[in-house]
Amino acid sequence: MIHLFVIADDFTGALDTGVQFASYGAATKVVVGTGLQALEADAQTQVLVVDAETRHLPAAQAYDTVYRLVRWAKEKKIGCIYKKTDSALRGNIGAELSAALAADGGDRLHFVPAFPNLDRVTRGGVHYIGGVPGAQSVFGKDPFEPVTHSRVEDILHEQTDTLCAYIPGGGSAEGKAGVLVYEAQTNRDMAQIADQLAARSETGLLAGCAGFASVLPRLLQLSCRDTAPLPLCGRLLAVCGSINPVSLEQCAQAEAQGAPRFSLTPEQKLSRDWAAGAQAGEMLGAVLRACSQEPVVVLDTGGAVENAGADKTADRIQIANTLGALLKRLLDDGLESTVLIMGGDCLLGLMRQLDVTEI
């Protein structure tokens, strides 16, 4: 029976939220796509996470998608609906939270955007990342959706006129309506917020990133089951489709310490047919040989593409598809390494190649 329905705006978000419950031992299912027929789960599933792929949609379309999913969950009488947001507050935050509130039919949505374990906290109404306001952080320079405001209410009001109210640490939500934005700087703060919501029986409509999601298993009293660890090969192939500076630095550090690194050129990663050709086959042969001889090998896209094209979303999808096709060829050719995929789009590209829609 589904106790919790999570709506994420991208695949990375769906996974980093789903893992909060899977690691606890709750039966968790992550589904890609918003076709309602695909959202049914077996009787053992406690947590259903859907990747709605709304991060890069126009705000109105994101609103409609979230509204429809929340209505589905209400009709199924699921006890808790969680609108997962990006921990840096990128994406259609205002449109999606207002849609969730409207579809729910209640008067309050409780939003806890902090993720203290990643040094992302909300203080005085401002969202801080690594100690600086969000718009001044690395996410203010995001090539796809830069964060342009640091005050949470300003971010919400970019896309909605729904009422917002800020709840400071230790403050009361009494008499407040709309999207309630909670201050949280520590895991203890988040646990206290969860306890307050439980005491008031207001756990039906929540929002936040994977940080607040981590307190939900206890809050919702999800049952725990034993999980066996997966056996891993001692060799590692890191496949990086992310353009996050931290990910790129990790690839550079691995190379500096002796790991063979294979980087795609802009032309290769943006081509629709290069991954299926002979030149790609030669490179993949070299990757396979390196994987059989070295403990760590890196295959990456070489960072952002300068002046790649007007349609950045199409470029992003094509790059993910190229990496997915390359990785499938490696697996088909007998790759015997543990694969670390960096970037949700990259993993989604592989899943498309394998015709897999859920995990």
Predicted regions and their residues:
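Cap/lid and interdomain-hinge subdomains that line or gate substrate/regulatory clefts
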Residues: 1-5, 27-31, 46, 62, ...
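Short beta-strand segments
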Residues: 7, 49-51, 83-84, 110-115, ...
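N-terminal short beta-loop-beta anion/metal-coordinating cradle
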Residues: 24-47, 281-295
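Glycine-rich, highly charged phosphate/nucleotide-binding loops
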Residues: 33-37, 56-72, 319-322
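Short, structured active-site "lid" loops
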Residues: 44-60
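Conserved, well-structured core segments that form the ligand-binding/active-site neighborhood
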Residues: 129-283
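C-terminal structural cap/anchor segments
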Residues: 287-345
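Conserved, well-ordered active-site substructure
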Residues: 342-359
